[in-house]
Amino acid sequence: MIRSKRKINKLRGSRSNGGGCTKKRRGAGNKGGRGNAGASKQHWTWTAKFDPDHYGKHGFKRPQKMIKKVNPVNLSYLEEQADNLIESGKASKDGDSIVIDVTELGYDKVLAKGKITKSFIISAPQFSASAIEKIEEMGGEAIEL
């Protein structure tokens, strides 16, 4: 049977809209709880349909001890700080070249950013390919530890 008016439209303005006493529709208790309450109980059908991955573990988290954070330094920084490093005893001069051990400064890798005008003998655990190229271009040496 086709209804000419929907029930809600018929009940407009009637204070309780077909819910009986007004007190009966108050609060979250009549809605089955607030928010996601009852997701595994009275609202399970909704959870199963619209949020099936809500329960259980998903994915994989790499152990933090397996992740090694690389602390890089640029050639431009070493160029700028060369004189200061020699004064403080963290670097030394060997003829025309400046000898630097990057691990003493707390770095793990040498990157090639910036131009260098001096000859360096740098020892580090890692170098970028372009850093090795720049160092050797100036007559220096890149020593991998």
From Swiss-Prot:
Coiled coil: none annotated. Pfam families: Ribosomal_L27A. Gene3D superfamilies: 3.100.10.10, 4.10.990.10. GO terms for cellular component: cytosolic large ribosomal subunit. It comes from the Archaea. One of its GO terms (molecular function) is structural constituent of ribosome. Residues 1-44 are annotated as: Disordered. InterPro entries: Rbsml_uL15_N, Ribosomal_uL15, Ribosomal_uL15/eL18, Ribosomal_uL15/eL18_sf, Ribosomal_uL15_CS. GO terms for biological process: translation. Keywords: Ribonucleoprotein, Ribosomal protein, RNA-binding, rRNA-binding. Residues 1-13 have a biased composition (Basic residues). Belongs to the universal ribosomal protein uL15 family. Part of the 50S ribosomal subunit. Binds to the 23S rRNA. PANTHER family: 60S RIBOSOMAL PROTEIN L27A (PTHR11721), LARGE RIBOSOMAL SUBUNIT PROTEIN UL15 (PTHR11721:SF3). This is Large ribosomal subunit protein uL15. It comes from Methanobrevibacter smithii (strain ATCC 35061 / DSM 861 / OCM 144 / PS). The gene is rpl15.
